[in-house]
Design a protein with these regions (language model features):
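Acidic-enriched and Gly/Ser
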Residues: 1-112, 127, 136-172
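A generic structural signal for beta-strand entry/edge sites
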Residues: 132-134
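Short beta-strand-centered aromatic/proline hotspots
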Residues: 120-128
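Short, charged beta-turn/beta-strand-edge "cap" motif at the junction between a beta-strand
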Residues: 58, 116-119
Length: 172
């Protein structure tokens, strides 16, 4: 997997042009909730603005096809991603679909993810915003740390019965 740097806003155009040439490429997107005139609206936003991930071997023919795409500026690195980084990117690309909203709750100042894409990155979450319905995780690509912000809906933490109550011993 290789990283293509392209003009901001032209990511999907580059992906479409490469798909017409039978070259697999992805521009990871995420769904987020935003307030617009007092209402919550779902929006689709690029995860890495200006970057497209090429899921092919970089042969001279592939390189010429990539260069011919309108909006492509350059390939960031001629070396492949490490297996861990490639796994992250494949997970974030989600076969070309936008990453959905995750669900979780806050208990003891820590965010616990119960469902969604952030569940895999729960140990990498560095901050969250309950009001903005977002959580930020740290991902390493080509040795550089990137912060990715994904949508997260917050639930009420589950109630755990206390051991001292009479009914708790029958539940456990």
């Amino acid at each position: 997997m290789y990283v293509i740097y392209c003009s901001s806003g032209k990511e999907m155009s580059v992906v479409r042009q490469l798909a017409e040439k039978n070259i697999r490429a992805y521009a990871p997107r995420r769904l987020v909730m935003e307030r617009h005139f007092g209402r919550w609206v779902r929006r689709e936003i690029f995860l890495f603005s200006g970057y497209v991930f090429l899921d092919e071997e970089l042969t001279p023919d592939t390189w010429q096809a990539v260069k011919a795409c309108y909006g492509t500026l350059r390939i960031l690195s001629r070396s492949q991603l490490s297996p861990t980084e490639e796994e992250y990117i494949r997970f974030l690309c989600n076969d070309g679909h936008a990453l959905g909203m995750s669900r979780g709750y806050v208990a003891g100042g820590a965010l616990h993810i119960t469902d969604g894409f952030l569940r895999r990155f729960e140990h990498k979450i560095i901050r969250y915003n309950k009001r903005g319905k977002r959580a930020t995780a740290d991902v390493t690509i080509y040795g550089r740390h990137y912060e990715i912000t994904l949508g997260c809906e917050f639930d009420v933490p589950p109630v755990i019965p206390s051991i001292s109550s009479g009914t708790a011993k029958y539940i456990l």
